[in-house]
């Protein structure tokens, strides 16, 4: 998250997405929670928040894309970004940087969201794809999708259709190793793993690939006001903010 490398932002998947989904607002009784992870969560949070606003037609107050940490077998808390005291370091607890999003439980919506996710991968050579922030290495940056039911989910076919680069979808067991250079994306059961919101100062942050507009950064205050973001994660100050 602290290193910089330049790649083009994921705009094509948004512009190529289907017309705005019907019933894209939040709060439906059947909404599902999906986690997307690949590299630093700043890029994935931006991609998915823009997907919510542009494709689902959600207002700023309805955005649900929250940055955080998930996928670890260790249930300890708090779960935090790297800090001087070494308190609750997410990667040491087996977690990866991830984004949680609430979606209507339709195959079309999940496929659209997953297509945005898969569009973020870049060619590494030898028909292998990986995260764009190639200097961020280690299990804390591994790629996974977590949805209800995991590989047994009836919606998994939507994820497979969105898999633009033909990457291998494999079962994750929690606290999994890095996926960089393997052309793999783990699939987890989101109901089996807790999502830990990242520190507020890391939410809706500029990415290492460039800056985002003020209208995007303002989402932090909007989600704090509607309590979708909580101010106290129990984490100390970190090496970013």
PLM feature spans:
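Cleavable N-terminal signal peptides of Sec/SRP-targeted secreted and luminal proteins
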Residues: 1-13
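Flexible coil/turn and secondary-structure edge motifs
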Residues: 14-241
């Amino acid at each position: 998250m602290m290193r910089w490398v330049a790649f083009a932002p994921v705009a094509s998947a948004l512009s190529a997405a289907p017309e705005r989904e019907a019933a894209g607002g939040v709060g439906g009784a059947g909404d599902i929670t999906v986690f997307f992870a690949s590299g630093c969560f700043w890029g994935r949070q931006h991609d998915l928040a823009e997907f919510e606003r542009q494709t689902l037609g959600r207002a700023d107050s309805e955005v649900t894309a929250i940055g955080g940490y998930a996928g670890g077998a260790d249930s300890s808390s708090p779960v935090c970004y790297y800090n001087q005291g070494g308190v609750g370091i997410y990667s040491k607890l087996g977690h990866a940087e991830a984004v949680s999003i609430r979606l209507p439980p339709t195959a079309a919506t999940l496929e659209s969201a997953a297509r945005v996710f898969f569009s973020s991968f870049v060619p590494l050579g030898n028909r292998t794809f990986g995260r764009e922030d190639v200097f961020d290495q280690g299990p804390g940056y591994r790629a996974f999708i977590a949805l209800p039911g995991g590989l047994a989910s009836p919606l998994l076919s939507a994820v497979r259709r969105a898999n633009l680069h033909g990457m291998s979808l494999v079962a994750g067991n929690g606290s999994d190793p890095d996926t960089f250079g393997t052309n793999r994306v783990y699939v987890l059961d989101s109901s089996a793993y807790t999502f830990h919101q990242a520190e507020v100062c890391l939410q809706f942050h500029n990415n290492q690939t460039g800056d985002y507009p003020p209208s995007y950064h303002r989402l932090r205050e909007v989600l704090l006001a509607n309590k979708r973001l909580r101010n106290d994660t129990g984490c100390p100050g970190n090496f970013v903010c």
